[in-house]
């Protein structure tokens, strides 16, 4: 047996390398021969070593999983078990004092909410106070808008301005600056004796009824007076015809009796009925009384009628009367 045969054992066909015999290498150091490994063989060796490492790593992980499962099974077992009846068994898994654990849990939760969101807690507290602050500011602004007399106990709301003229004896009390019945300047009936134009009526704005509809029916007498001075004979029959038409007081038929005190003095005098006599006898007296009343009231003051606010009714009647004359 040669030295080469001793060093190299026979290998099957296709072996990648020959491993020397250590005994032969010691006896024949010169005959020791180890061929260089090829690149493909190195890759195979690296893959094999990695597989062994992965197997070694997975084995302890499986053991850890098994240990954890065993611990969970032990935890799932109830700490106490109480038999209530044949169909009910009470298992208690909690170990320790339940009350102390619950208190600790809620105190910890509340403490974390305050420490994590301090701004939100402050904003919520402000939001709870803002409606009260807004209400107080709104009340203070409203209090400043009203007069001081409104907040006193002796304050009384002022009456409507039109109530002062319902009756001359009716007294209206109110704070200064409101309408009073003692001041006759706003009413047009008290200004007819003046020669200059009367101031505009300030109370007519609050009166819902137009003044022309109240006094316009009685202006036929004034028209008769006016036509008597300018056309004494040409239209006498027309005046008598109008007189027969207005024999009964026209203002009383057109107006409600409750509006009687609101009329002017001359109109109020014209509305007083004459004694019940013959029509032919009362005709001159009625014409004379109405003519004298209107002539005395409107002596030199016919031009002030448009300033009082009766121009619309007068113009309308003048246009209706001019059609048969001209």
Curated annotation (Swiss-Prot):
Cross-link Glycyl lysine isopeptide (Lys-Gly) (interchain with G-Cter in SUMO2), sequence positions: 62, 126
Segments of skewed composition (Acidic residues): 64-75
Tissue spec: Enriched in placenta.
Keywords carried by this UniProt record: Isopeptide bond, Nucleus, Transcription, Transcription regulation, Ubl conjugation
Biological processes per GO annotation: regulation of transcription by RNA polymerase II
Cell compartments where the protein resides: Nucleus
Gene Ontology CC, one term: nucleus
Xref: InterPro entries: TDU_repeat (IPR006627), Vg_fam (IPR011520)
UniProt feature, compositional bias: Basic residues: 233-249
Annotated segments matching region Disordered: 57-80, 175-203, 233-256
Intrachain disulfide bonds: none
PANTHER family, per the entry: TRANSCRIPTION COFACTOR VESTIGIAL-LIKE PROTEIN, TRANSCRIPTION COFACTOR VESTIGIAL-LIKE PROTEIN 3
Family stated for the protein in its record: Belongs to the vestigial family.
Function according to Swiss-Prot or TrEMBL: May act as a specific coactivator for the mammalian TEFs.
Protein name: Transcription cofactor vestigial-like protein 3
Organism the protein comes from: Homo sapiens
